[in-house]
């Protein structure tokens, strides 16, 4: 985001979380960022919520569920258990296929408004 500021570059990204997708999560993360100068600095100087923050939050809890389902910390057992794990997180419903890839039904397409230095929502894509 910072690298594109003031340029005429066009960047489009797809993500599994759009800011505003979970008000409770957004409010909590923004309160943390705005209440911690270091967090705000490392967040680019503002309280924009990146999708990776929400997905990182979810992956922590998904990993805990996978460890519980496996009854072990052995990587092979966790991978074996993963297809049976589902989780309703801040970024939506998360499930896994037989190889451990996430099954998601919605992606959000965003672009950068280089003048305002913010992400702009473009469209939502739903799996058919």
Which residues make up each language-model segment?
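Extracytosolic ligand-binding ectodomains
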Residues: 1-128
């Amino acid at each position: 985001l910072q690298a594109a500021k003031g340029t005429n570059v066009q960047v489009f990204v797809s993500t599994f979380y759009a800011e505003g997708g979970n008000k409770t999560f957004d409010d909590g993360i923004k309160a943390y960022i705005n209440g911690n100068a270091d967090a705000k600095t490392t967040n680019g100087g503002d309280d924009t919520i990146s999708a990776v923050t929400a997905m990182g939050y979810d992956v922590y809890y998904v990993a805990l569920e996978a460890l519980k389902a496996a009854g072990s910390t052995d990587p092979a057992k966790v991978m074996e258990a993963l297809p049976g794990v589902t989780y309703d997180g801040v970024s939506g419903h998360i499930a896994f296929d037989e190889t451990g890839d996430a099954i998601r039904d919605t992606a959000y397409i965003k672009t950068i408004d280089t003048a305002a230095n913010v992400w702009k929502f473009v469209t939502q894509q739903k799996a058919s």
